[in-house]
């Protein structure tokens, strides 16, 4: 029987934690980033690293910004090399995982569910 939930190894969890902390630090500093990110407060909601440790999926949520999600994604992708270099300096591995950014729909989904429950 297949497990319903995915389990993550200790290495995956540790690497995800390091990447999360590094992302928070580089976003706070703002150095080497796309200028559109300077006035765009972001929250990194979670980081999920694949089993082979080659891809880090980073989920974010913007707050009080005039930028669209597409503009934020474009700015993050333009800054991806600088972010990856910063993370490479933080980890002690042969390679640095590829960073992929995703908008976190979790809060939007929670609001939709709350509205549906309210309408019952």
UniProtKB/Swiss-Prot annotation:
PANTHER family hit by this protein: RIBOSOME-BINDING FACTOR A, CHLOROPLASTIC-RELATED
Any one GO CC term of the record: cytosol
PROSITE patterns xrefs: RBFA
Keyword Cytoplasm: yes
Any one Gene Ontology BP term: maturation of SSU-rRNA
Name of the protein described by the UniProt record: Ribosome-binding factor A
Function: One of several proteins that assist in the late maturation steps of the functional core of the 30S ribosomal subunit. Associates with free 30S ribosomal subunits (but not with 30S subunits that are part of 70S ribosomes or polysomes). Required for efficient processing of 16S rRNA. May interact with the 5'-terminal helix region of 16S rRNA.
Subcellular location: Cytoplasm
Domain of life: Bacteria
Keywords: Cytoplasm, Ribosome biogenesis
The protein's assembly and partners: Monomer. Binds 30S ribosomal subunits, but not 50S ribosomal subunits or 70S ribosomes.
Example of a GO MF term: ribosomal small subunit binding
Similarity field: Belongs to the RbfA family.
């Amino acid at each position: 029987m297949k497990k319903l939930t995915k389990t993550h190894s200790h290495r995956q969890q540790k690497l995800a934690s390091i990447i999360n902390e590094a992302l928070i630090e580089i976003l706070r500093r703002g150095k080497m980033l796309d200028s559109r990110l300077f006035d765009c407060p972001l929250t990194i909601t979670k980081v999920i690293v694949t089993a082979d440790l080659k891809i880090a999926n980073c989920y974010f949520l913007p707050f009080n910004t005039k930028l669209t999600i597409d503009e934020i994604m474009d700015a993050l992708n333009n800054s991806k090399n600088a972010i990856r270099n910063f993370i490479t300096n933080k980890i002690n591995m042969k390679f640095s995982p590829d960073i992929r950014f995703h908008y976190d729909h979790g809060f939007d989904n929670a609001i939709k569910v709350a509205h549906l429950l309210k309408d019952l």
